[in-house]
Amino acid sequence: MKDFLQKITTEGKAMYLAYDHGFEHGPADLPGKSIDPNYILNIAVEGGYNAVILQKGLAEKYYTGTKYQKQVPLILKINGKANIWQGGDIYSYQNCSVQYAKQLGASAVGYTIYLGSAHDGKMFADFGRIVEEAHKLNMAAIAWVYPRGEFVKDETSKEITAYAARIGLELGADMVKIKYSGSRENFEYAVKAAGKTKVVLSGGPKVSDEEFLQIMRDVIAAGAIGVAVGRNVWQHPEPLEITRKIREIIFS
């Protein structure tokens, strides 16, 4: 099977700078300089990230055809939702085609699946099609799999996190992005469940440096290939310094 992740990994490891938060969480998650996409893209370049993760509007206006396109690969997030609606089950609609992502210069596409939502079957079908379309265009397909819904009692439990990882494998994802499940042992179970689909950690909300770096040590020891980190870098007062510490853990 072809390695579609080659353009966005280094010797099988990966460090991605995620910046799809403006869509998903709103400007409240983008304090200070982080509201400026150029600030984020400069961190991605100077920090040596394997890719930056953007929604299509940011890619159109700040990445495609700019100096950044030659300096850091792009993972285009092709679905999303706002966080204002708090009721009922979630369905995250696709807002960009795989073909258009390719035109924007993306090396990979990302798609969120809410495992446990009443609409997860639609998202499974969407992502299955997206994988096929991406591979035809020599692009990687990455699944963000987040357990949500009435019947999900603990979205970061050992079993449900492993189930999220397994969904990525079953749907043909090249990589699956999942949340931390509380310990190295628990995360190792998720990595095993993912089989030949590579696993990266979802960086999550801003926490202390010590806590985040320990989580990074746990997941790399468990077999994850890296992280897609956002707030713990660009909300940090010294984003390049915390990047250096993350890099040491992943690539040492």
Stretches found by the model and what they are:
Residues 1-11:
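N-terminal basic/disordered segments at the start of proteins
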Residues 14-52, 56-83, 87-199, 210-225, ...:
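Alpha/beta enzyme core
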Residues 201-203, 229:
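Thr-Gly-centered strand-to-loop micro-motif
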Residues 206:
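A C-terminal functional module that forms or caps the active site or interfaces directly
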Residues 227-234:
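Short acidic/histidine-rich active-site segments
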Residues 235-240:
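Short glycine/proline-enriched turn or capping motifs at secondary-structure junctions
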